[in-house]
């Protein structure tokens, strides 16, 4: 009899992440049986609950945007410093060269989790129901959905928005009830969450380049046979390559799909990004004062 692995996520069928988890499961289907809850928010659960569910071995494998780990792993906020990285490849290089090892050790030592890898969660952009975002005045008095991250809340308040922290579960409801004026997400989430139906101004700000942590319960993993562990690690590595490719393909086609929904799109200029960078620079400085070992800037 094959061992059963319980897997869970927080996005729908069309999501890059859901399709990537499908790929991972298929790679291992000859060795393991799987119970897969694709979107726990449909069951009324918060996306953030995936962390405790995996740590406690209620499920064995999950993915989740790294920001949700900030209270348990505050150094992860390096990936959440707005306008800090110039492009996604810069972040990927940092992860591969330095950050992966650090995060992996922290998860194993402190959280009973084993890191299977980082997934591409997309460049994050800002949409509103009023106008494009190009200076502080364009942010003024807009109620923007942020994650429950204290850093995110403070950053958007600083820019002039009114931060409304919501888990993915509650964000979907706030959208349908028209209770927010703005939000920030990668293009794939903008589309799959249906933001294009109510927010017709999309600013390509690339203020963050997001990544998900793809993890397995450490106790569960350690009890597996060596061959089973090898198969999971091999499948995880192949899934990361597949997921990165899928994410790039998704982004390239989504712009036209979004435009076809009568959404106006504006790309933030370098000068505008630099002006916003000056505004949020204190958050960068505070982070590196608190976590000086996270200043990998010289080696990026």
Identify the role of each PLM range.
Residues 1-88, 108-109, 113-300:
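N-terminal secretory/targeting leader peptides
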Residues 86-107:
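A gly/proline- and charged-residue-enriched helix-loop-helix capping module
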């Amino acid at each position: 009899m094959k061992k059963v692995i319980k897997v869970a996520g927080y996005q729908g069928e069309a999501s890059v992440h859901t399709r990537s988890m499908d790929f991972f499961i298929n790679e291992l289907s000859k060795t393991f049986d799987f119970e897969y809850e694709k979107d726990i928010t449909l069951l009324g659960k918060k996306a953030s609950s995936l962390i405790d569910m995996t740590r406690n071995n209620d499920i064995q494998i999950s993915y989740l945007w790294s920001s949700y780990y900030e209270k348990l792993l505050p150094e992860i906020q390096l990936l959440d410093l707005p306008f800090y990285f110039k492009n996604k490849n810069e972040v990927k290089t940092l992860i591969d060269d330095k950050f992966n090892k650090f995060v992996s050790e922290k998860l194993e030592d402190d959280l009973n989790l084993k890191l299977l890898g980082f997934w591409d969660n997309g460049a994050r952009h800002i949409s509103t129901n009023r106008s494009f975002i190009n200076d502080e005045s364009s942010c003024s008095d807009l109620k923007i959905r942020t994650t429950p991250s204290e850093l995110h809340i403070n950053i958007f308040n600083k820019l002039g928005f009114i931060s409304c922290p919501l888990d993915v579960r509650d964000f979907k409801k706030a959208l349908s009830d028209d209770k927010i004026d703005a939000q920030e997400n990668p293009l794939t989430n903008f589309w799959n969450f249906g933001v294009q139906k109510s927010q017709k101004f999309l600013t390509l700000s690339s203020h963050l380049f997001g990544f998900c942590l793809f993890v397995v319960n450490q106790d569960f993993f350690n009890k597996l046979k060596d061959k089973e562990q090898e198969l999971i690690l091999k499948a995880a590595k192949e899934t990361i390559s597949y997921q990165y490719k899928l994410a790039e393909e998704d982004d390239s086609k989504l712009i036209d799909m979004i435009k076809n929904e009568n959404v106006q799109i504006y790309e933030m200029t370098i000068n505008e990004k630099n002006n916003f960078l000056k505004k949020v620079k204190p958050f960068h400085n505070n982070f590196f004062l608190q976590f000086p070992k996270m200043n990998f800037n010289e080696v990026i």
